[in-house]
Amino acid sequence: MEKQLLDVLVELNGVWLSRSGLLHGIRNFEITTKHIHIETDCGARFTVRNSRSSRSARSLRHNKYRKPCKRCRPADEQIDRFVKKTFKEKRQTVSVFSSPKKHVPKKPKVAVIKSFSISTPSPKEASVSNSIPTPSISVVKDEVKVPEVKYTPSQIERLKTLMSPDDKIPIQDELPEFKVLEKELIQRRRDDLKKMYEEDREDRLGKLERDITEFFVDRGFLEIKSPIMIPFEYIERMGIDKDDHLNKQIFRVDESMCLRPMLAPCLYNYLRKLDKVLPDPIRIFEIGPCYRKESDGSSHLEEFTMVNFCQMGSGCTRENMEALIDEFLEHLGIEYEIEADNCMVYGDTIDIMHGDLELSSAVVGPIPLDREWGVNKPWMGAGFGLERLLKVRHNYTNIRRASRSELYYNGINTNL
């Protein structure tokens, strides 16, 4: 049965589930060409892509929520409707007469390795055996019971780094020995690298930078290249004091200089200076590396590449900001949702989400911070992490595959 679009799910449920798990009553919603604009009973506004496969659509198909919104106070009937899904229509049963089908012998089913996970014995099991518990690989398979083959943690990590998002390893009776599987994956990655060398020869991160540059230059934006080392004073002027968590993530060069953790400070300076020269509106953008002492994870890097684009003067509205973001992500072929949020530096922001991954935070000014930089006109701007865009486009499980790295080239492990 075909999945319903988000607007149908909103109408059927009669409630909205925010990213934080709050259940809201719906005051009104409107549908445009690609988006649905929702206003809740508490006055919150959400703009999301009208998609069947978005995070919002998936959440409305289920019946779990964290708690009702205290300001909306949805009625018990609304909550009951969402939880029990009483609106679902029963499927009709249709009898069809047809000629008997010819018997075709079934082919033996083949299991496919799709993912790895480490499992260890329970304390009770561990007490029975004196041997050291060995991690094992769990196999996602299609109705075939396969004996579990045990690999060491280092072997599992090695296989993970060698596998690509599209890898499927067919097996008949049991998992192959580690050396056999490793050899097969190494040969695949060597073939992938040879194919890239013969057909493309472009680094994906560099290619994305060039593609984004062309996109914004064609739309009248001036490209900026600002210093990577900036005065630490810029950080303080962004409202980040010594008690803020971002302050602890900054790479300091000496007492007065640091590696930039963001592009915004220098873009603020450019807006102020160019306002004396360029016609209204002023449009600028920059692509470049930033540095933060980020925690380890599948979505964070200490060295990452940002694109920030902003416009100052006339036409700086939320509608124009969302339209530009929509055009940009459609150009890159990336689906997204828009959600309202709040951050320490800019206050109210427009978050651009792909599933649970934040791609960007956009802001429509003026905001109180502008006074610190001598900017006194309306503006709008957004920033995207290029490695996150690549992670989404190529379905990488770990963002390091998209980063500046010696370990990976275009997502392929180079230790072959």
Swiss-Prot record:
A GO cellular component annotated for this chain's UniProt record is: cytoplasm
Name the family: Belongs to the class-II aminoacyl-tRNA synthetase family.
Work out whether the entry's keyword set contains Nucleotide-binding. yes
Per the UniProt entry, what species is this protein from, by scientific name?
Methanococcoides burtonii (strain DSM 6242 / NBRC 107633 / OCM 468 / ACE-M)
Question: What processes does the entry annotate via GO biological process terms?
Answer: tRNA aminoacylation for protein translation
Q: What InterPro entries does this protein map onto?
A: aa-tRNA-synth_II (IPR006195), aa-tRNA-synth_II/BPL/LPL (IPR045864), Phenylalanyl-tRNA_Synthase (IPR002319), Pyrrolysyl-tRNA_ligase (IPR012739), Pyrrolysyl-tRNA_ligase_C (IPR023877), Pyrrolysyl-tRNA_ligase_N (IPR023878)
Q: What Enzyme Commission number(s) does the record list for this chain? A: 6.1.1.26
Q: What is its main location?
A: cytoplasm
Please list the reactions this protein catalyses: tRNA(Pyl) + L-pyrrolysine + ATP = L-pyrrolysyl-tRNA(Pyl) + AMP + diphosphate
Cross-referenced Pfam families: tRNA-synt_2d
Intracellular or extracellular location(s): Cytoplasm
Q: Which GO MF terms does the UniProt record name? A: ATP binding; pyrrolysyl-tRNA synthetase activity; tRNA binding
Q: What does this protein do?
A: Catalyzes the attachment of pyrrolysine to tRNA(Pyl). Pyrrolysine is a lysine derivative encoded by the termination codon UAG.
Q: Which HAMAP family match?
A: Pyl_tRNA_synth
Give the gene that encodes this protein.
pylS
- Xref: SUPFAM superfamilies: Class II aaRS and biotin synthetases
What is the designated name of this protein? Pyrrolysine--tRNA ligase
Keywords for the protein's UniProt record, in alphabetical order: Aminoacyl-tRNA synthetase, ATP-binding, Cytoplasm, Ligase, Nucleotide-binding, Protein biosynthesis
